[in-house]
Swiss-Prot record:
Residues 37-48 have a biased composition (Acidic residues). This is Beta-catenin-like protein 1 homolog. It comes from Schizosaccharomyces pombe (strain 972 / ATCC 24843). ARM repeats lie at residues 179-229, 230-276, 277-326, 328-366, 367-411. The modification Phosphoserine is found at residue 39. One of its GO terms (biological process) is mRNA cis splicing, via spliceosome. It comes from the Eukaryota. It holds the Pfam family CTNNBL. InterPro entries: ARM-like, ARM-type_fold, CTNNBL1, CTNNBL1_N. Keywords: Coiled coil, mRNA processing, mRNA splicing, Nucleus, Phosphoprotein, Repeat, Spliceosome.
Length: 564
């Protein structure tokens, strides 16, 4: 049967329906006979059950052919990849690679003579995508040294081949792949030098070209997959590649409309910084604090647009959160007037305010944070952090605000103008800040008591897993913000008689023994670890005292017990 002649014959299918036939008064049998003589298409178009739009639009002969093809497909069993077929695929790939190389050498000045071989090579590489559905064959894939083959192909002169290999590796390292197979493939890729190769590959691409932009995206996507398997490779990325430098440089590029690659580069940089101290120090040395502050500077005046720009902004703030956890990062943040920018962001009350508060939390926390706390007060930060404290109810942001207030109590030197200004904020407007603080304390106290009661009813054998489970339950129900409220209320008790009197009144009105506050502080103290001093911290901030948490709380607890 000539299938082409059937589908290409338009003589009948192009006929128009005769309105006179539709209005015919002939018996139904005569009309059916007439329709059969003309074409099944007319019957399909005016099917009584569904109207012409529900018909198949096919003649009987065409429908017969399609039914036959459907039956043939139904009878065929879906092909499955076997070890033997995988070996054949590898052999075909090697032959295609060799053929392409020979033609490239032979016709180096005539690309049209070898372009077909590269199309064949592209198809052979893509054929390996199916391997992600057969993780049991990954060991054979590795034994056949396919990793080396594909990594060599990443250096191919044709960037399209490089991109096809990247797409294959993305597919094979997807999180949905069997964990055991993924881990073995991951180890082989890292041991074979994939990370330095990615560093060189990403520099090959010119993002002014659409295909190359896709290549950059593929490198970033593969990096994300690898980091999700094991983020310990961050140390290799820092020591053996220039990927951090590239990511920082790409993150600082100004774009009128934030591109996917810019957003992705900042996201990958944030992941690396969150998992590597070496990366944090490297970015600090590369003037990264200044570059990232410039990146978020526009948001002191406007909000980012939804989508890529907003996500990019959040990732930049995450980068800064990681950097200011290091002593060097804190110092550079102060030097580059990061605190002043944060205050402008809080003043704007836009989307950046919440992320700004998070950065300030990490900046002001720590044993060497006195200069940053002083600068925060000097720059006028108290007005805006307390305004946020009184209005913001989102649990995660409120947790950061409470931590900031606790850090200010910890680090602002006694009998200084900055500390006096800070204390006055709790007293002004009829103690409104203290009243709100107490309400938060009481709400969190009740939540955590509920967890303690549930734990007492858990009669399963004691184990580390059980302890972890209940500790996580406490965290979910506000353990950390509760600890901050305990510290703040305790400081207010020992600062002066006015604040102590007000706190006693608040506890009395709520029928809560103030001894509960002392007990909560004691419990917090017992769970603190002994302080450790890192080498770079010894050299930093020698003009200020080091204030470690446990010794500070020890003194606070003694003063608290004496006061109440």
């Amino acid at each position: 049967m000539d299938v082409d002649s059937i589908f290409k014959n338009t003589e009948e299918t192009n006929k128009k329906r005769n309105p006179e036939e539709a209005d015919s008064l002939e018996p139904a049998s005569s009309r059916r006979r007439l329709a059969e003589e003309n074409s099944d298409e007319e019957n399909e178009e005016f099917d009584e059950e569904g109207g012409r739009f529900f018909g198949s639009g096919l003649k009987k002969s065409e429908k017969t052919v399609l039914d036959f093809l459907d039956e043939q497909e139904a009878q065929e069993e879906p092909a499955s990849l076997t070890p033997t077929e995988l070996k054949r695929m590898v052999v075909r790939l090697e032959k295609t690679i060799n053929n392409n190389q020979e033609l490239r050498i032979k016709y180096s000045t005539s690309p049209q003579r070898f372009i077909e071989s590269e199309a064949d090579l592209d198809l052979e590489i893509r054929s390996f995508n199916v391997l992600s559905e057969y993780p049991i064959l990954i060991p054979i894939f590795l034994k056949l040294d396919c990793v080396s083959t594909f990594l060599e192909l990443m250096n191919h002169e044709n960037a399209d081949i490089t991109i096809t290999v990247l797409e294959l590796l993305i597919e094979l390292t997807d999180e949905d792949v069997d964990p055991d197979a993924l881990n073995s493939l991951f180890t082989s890729l890292i041991d074979s030098g994939l990370l330095p190769l990615l560093s060189n590959t990403i520099k090959r691409f010119d993002e002014s070209n659409e295909e190359d932009r896709h290549g950059v995206y593929c490198v970033l996507s593969l990096m994300e997959n690898l980091l999700s398997v094991d983020n310990s490779i961050c140390s290799i990325i820092v020591e053996n590649t220039t990927l951090v430098e590239w990511l920082l440089s790409r993150s600082s590029v100004d774009e009128t409309s934030i591109s996917t690659n810019l957003q992705y580069a900042v996201e990958i940089l944030a992941i690396i910084l969150a998992n590597s101290k070496e990366a944090k120090l490297k970015v600090c040395n590369l003037n990264g604090i200044d570059l990232l502050l410039r990146r978020i500077s526009p948001y002191r005046l406007r909000d980012p647009t939804q989508g890529s720009e907003e996500e990019m902004m959040e990732n930049v703030f995450d980068c800064l959160c990681s950097l200011v956890q290091e002593t060097k990062g804190k110092s550079l943040f102060l030097k580059e007037e990061g605190i002043e920018l944060c205050i402008l962001n809080m003043k704007h009350k836009g989307k950046s305010r919440y992320s700004t508060i998070k950065v300030l939390d990490y900046l002001l926390f720590g044993p060497l944070s006195t200069p940053y706390c002083i600068r925060f007060v000097e720059a006028g930060g108290l007005k805006y952090i307390f305004a946020a404290f009184m209005k913001i109810s989102a649990a995660d942001t409120l947790e950061h605000i409470l931590a900031i207030l606790a850090s200010l109590f910890r680090s602002l030197p006694a009998d200084t103008v900055e500390r006096v200004r800070f204390l006055r904020k709790f007293i002004e407007n009829d103690f409104e800040k203290m009243k709100r603080l107490f309400k938060i304390y009481d709400r969190l106290r009740i939540q955590l008591k509920g967890i303690d009661q549930s734990r007492k009813l858990d009669f399963s054998p004691d184990s580390e897993e059980k302890s972890t489970k209940w500790f996580l339950q406490q965290i979910d129900h506000g353990l950390f913000p509760f600890q901050s409220t305990v510290l703040i209320l305790s400081w207010l008790c020992v600062e002066n008689t006015v604040t102590l009197k007000k706190i006693k009144m608040l506890f009395s009105e709520a029928s809560i023994p103030i001894d509960e506050l002392t007990d909560a502080l004691k419990n917090y103290h017992e769970n603190l670890e002994e302080p450790t001093v890192e080498s770079e911290e010894v050299e930093a901030n020698d003009s200020y005292y080091r204030i470690d948490e446990k010794p500070m709380v020890t003194v606070l607890l003694g003063s608290m017990q004496a006061s109440v």
